[in-house]
Amino acid sequence: MENAPLYPAFGSGQTLALLRDHAAQGYFMAGSLAADTLLGVRDAGMLSCSEYAAHLRRMRLLTDKPIIADLQSGFGNPMNTYFATQELERSGANRLILSDQRYPAHTQDCPPIATDVDFLGKLHAALDAVDDENTQIWALLEGMPTQGLETTMAKLAWVDQLPIGGIVIAHWDREILMALTAMPHQHRLIATWQPNVPAFPGIDGWLDTGYLADTAGNWQRQLITNLPAELALPKEVLK
């Protein structure tokens, strides 16, 4: 992963506080982790834009580093995407990731994908809504499981022509990354991160989607499993 930064994901203030000493270039407030923190449900689609934005504003107070926000599939049509982008930027987002999922977006392995016309309209809406010239829109391509490599390559080609800040590739394997990174492209290619993934030529960054939270959660579950239901009183108390 040399020269390719890792963007750790968080959903809670506790996790973000632990990450503050990490030499990251930015942190990703994953919608799924935010929903897990607020509702106990690991599904980004359970949060409205206003709920997510309110949580983002609180998290913004905990760090000066860039925060990557989860724009999901725009929270509706292109008009909704426009106003959602404005709200999240004003709430402290420095980067906003827009998924090509069909609305409503949900955290799943094989999500239904929007039409190219719909996704293009939302990308333009998000780009038009940005107020700060330093704020970036990243396009998230999630169609590999349902659309295949050829369709994803065609989509990457036209998405790359837009004035976005990067393209995030999800649901990949090594062959997929080899094919996509071999394509001519002008924008940064970022892949969702998997544990123990080796450095990969052509990938400019890795986006964590919850490994840290999963590891911490497994540790907590183990502690709770081993927690005794009752504690014996000391003998001196029983006398």
Where are these regions (language model features)?
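Structural signal for terminal/edge beta-strands and the immediately following C-terminal loop/tail
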Residues: 229-239
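Alpha/beta enzyme core
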Residues: 1-66, 73-230
